Amino acid sequence: MTTTRKELITKIGGLDIPSSKLKISELYIFKMTKDTRIAFKFGKALDVESRLKAVKKDLVEWEVMQIWKSSLSYMSWLEPQTSEYEKLIHYVLKMKFTKYADKYSDRPRGYTEMYDFGKFTEWDTRDFIEQCLQELIQNPKARNLQDIRNLRGNANAI
């Protein structure tokens, strides 16, 4: 008895996902420094190292370094699930951190995914994102932030 790829994915995740979307992706945080500006960029990628190289190539005046990727915490997901996690976490980040574009007038490529560190450290940022992910993973029926018990209306979750 053989199991097709579609059947296997349905059995594992309980999701009906097109085979074109059966790719594993992960989330990342890049620290970006230019003169006195320090920001971080949060997003998802199929290959974080390739994304890091592309960002460095596009933003040559910025010093860019990876400070976290989800696979280091043994977390990576199918592309549609990663996209949902990314959207929800961006929503929480907008409540917690100042958007880069709200503080500075320049518009580097990808500025919509950039946040100002403010008073927070790299570790605070990483821990906050990991905490958000943990809440999402512990509640598999969560479809939005209101479904997540500990994050509901709590912009200062750290």
Predicted regions and their residues:
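Non-catalytic accessory segments flanking enzymatic or RNA/DNA-binding domains
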Residues: 1-158
